[in-house]
């Protein structure tokens, strides 16, 4: 068994008790009075992933600079990963860009709720509500959701945490990793531009001077390029893979427990296909994302993961493809397309 890194030990010391406290709170017998709901399903999964009598399995963390093969997750800096990517380095493990300085003012819950109201105050938003019996997200008026978030989740009192997974990015400049500006990572934006020109009959390299109307064809790839996420403390999302390909997510505030399946052999993936987000792998490892951390999940790889929110959190993220692995990415896309149960989002129609 490889020796644990200092970073792994520090993470377990810093967050192990916090995670266990949240799990005990979720297991409170009072919550069983809610009947059969999404919350009950989530508790069943959490109890299987993290049995009460075991320590939290923190991932083996290693520096990307050493290309440590025995690490579950690489950690790096913005400068180091940008330099490596410029030399055609291929990322093959989940990687965290550590504690970026976001350079933003007004961060926090109030700022987020004000932005949500400014953008969508008279609209509806998709909400994962664990107090319902439906797996599908519930469409709720934004004003009601804002009120519920302001009230705050209180698991012992029966106010269960909600999850907003289908938000547009609310801002001007998303905090994407700088290396994504390299030409090899321009695959999805280029596809989007080409297909938009094909479907509209207007191949114009510039801003549109008029509204775009597309008949009988949905233009939906852009929605994958950037997105925003919000979840309250205790919100849980079961195991899934991201579609269409690689993902980056930056934690703007809060705390997230990211849980990875460590054994993705053929028999486990068959179970995953059959069970979807009810699947629990034989073994897992986890990391805690802190404010400013950016998690990058590599292109062309199937990385089943689940997420538990440790503190009210907002994330910004996006999707990308790597031209150096484009054939493998297409294989991944095809694999997901015939196994839709493994992803919590549909493949953009423009890629089908």
Outline where the language-model segments fall:
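N-terminal accessory scaffold of Fe(II)-dependent oxygenases
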Residues: 1-296, 304-352
């Amino acid at each position: 068994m490889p020796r644990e890194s200092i970073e792994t030990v520090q993470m377990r010391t810093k967050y192990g008790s916090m995670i266990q406290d949240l799990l005990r709170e979720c297991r409170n017998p009072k919550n069983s009075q809610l009947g059969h709901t999404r919350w009950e399903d989530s508790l069943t999964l959490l109890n299987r992933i993290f049995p009460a009598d075991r320590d939290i399995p923190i991932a083996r963390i290693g520096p990307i600079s050493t290309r440590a093969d025995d690490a579950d997750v690489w950690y790096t800096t913005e400068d180091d990963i940008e330099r490596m990517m410029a030399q055609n380095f291929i990322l093959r493990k989940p990687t965290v860009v550590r504690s970026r300085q976001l350079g933003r003012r007004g961060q926090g819950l109030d700022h987020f709720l004000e932005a949500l109201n400014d953008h969508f105050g008279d609209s509806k938003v998709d909400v994962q509500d664990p107090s319902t019996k439906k797996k599908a997200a519930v469409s709720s008026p934004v004003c009601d959701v804002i009120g519920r978030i302001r009230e705050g989740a209180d698991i012992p009192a029966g106010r269960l945490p909600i999850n907003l997974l289908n938000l547009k990015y609310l801002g001007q400049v998303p905090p994407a990793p700088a290396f994504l500006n390299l030409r090899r990572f321009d695959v999805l934006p280029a596809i989007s531009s080409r297909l938009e020109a094909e479907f509209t009959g207007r191949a114009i390299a510039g801003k549109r001077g008029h509204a775009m109307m597309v008949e009988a064809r949905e233009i939906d790839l852009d929605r994958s390029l950037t997105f925003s996420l919000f979840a309250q403390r205790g919100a849980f999302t079961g195991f899934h893979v991201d579609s269409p390909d690689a993902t980056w997510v930056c934690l703007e505030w809060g705390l997230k427990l990211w849980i990875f399946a460590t054994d993705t052999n053929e028999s486990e993936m068959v179970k995953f296909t059959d069970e979807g987000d009810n699947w629990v792998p034989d073994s897992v490892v986890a990391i805690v994302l802190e404010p400013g951390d950016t998690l990058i999940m590599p292109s062309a790889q199937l990385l089943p993961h689940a997420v538990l929110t440790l503190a009210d959190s907002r994330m910004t993220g996006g999707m990308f493809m790597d031209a150096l692995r484009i054939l493998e990415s297409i294989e991944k896309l095809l694999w997901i397309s015939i196994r839709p149960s493994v992803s919590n989002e549909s493949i953009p129609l423009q890629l089908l």
